[in-house]
From Swiss-Prot:
Protein's UniProt name: Sepiapterin reductase
Organism: Xenopus laevis (African clawed frog)
Its job: Catalyzes the final one or two reductions in tetra-hydrobiopterin biosynthesis to form 5,6,7,8-tetrahydrobiopterin.
The entry's keywords: Cytoplasm, NADP, Oxidoreductase
Keyword Transmembrane helix: no
Domain of life: Eukaryota
GO cellular component: cytoplasm
Localization terms from the record: Cytoplasm
Binding positions for NADP(+) per the UniProt entry: 18-24, 46-47, 73-74, 177, 204-209
Amino acid sequence: MTAARAGALGSVLCVLTGASRGFGRTLAHELCPRVLPGSTLLLVSRTEEALKGLAEELGHEFPGVRVRWAAADLSTTEGVSATVRAARELQAGTAHRLLIINNAGSIGDVSKMFVDFSAPEEVTEYMKFNVSSPLCLTASLLKTFPRRPDLQRLVVNVSSLAALQPYKSWVLYCSGKAARDMMFRVLAEEEDDVRVLSYAPGPLDTDMHEVACTQTADPELRRAIMDRKEKGNMVDIRVSANKMLDLLEADAYKSGDHIDFYD
């Protein structure tokens, strides 16, 4: 983080899902220095204690940023509604940017192959959290903070190479990520004032990666994932978070584009 970038994103109202750990937690820390004092960050996750702790950390380190949190299960209608209510109570105020970061997501059951998924309920539950939730949350937030001349609206979908490339035993994860990418491409086509970015952060050393290492059913893929970690070929999570924020600052991407860390 250089001095030249401090406050570069301006006055922002940001809603960040999946904020309590992993990439979301890192994004929260890296975003705060890039916004102007008086900006607001709404942290969303299922885990109340982790959110409280993160909010306290950020409040101490960045006293000029107003940090709020909402503990919500985004796989439910109630959780989405609670998040929208929390955002509405903040109001946009003097913010010149609305930034919605859809980071919450899960890898699903990677211990099974395609032919093992015979229960529709399991697939439906996965898609509720990973596809339906970001669609309904983003739609509701865009309605809550409608188009106005002095407000730039940005939507980020935290994506994956799995949105573009099939991986054996990752049928839920690949399908969910592909659906999300297309969903947000449609948003970019429909709303010409909304800047939309699907960003794939690369292989990160997170809890999700640990699940992939230990539970992936396909032995070749599992070995490749483990080898990458053992050889130190993971992406630094802070570097990836800052690349995403650099992309938002530069604002040079085509709305709806999928951009990978390695691009």
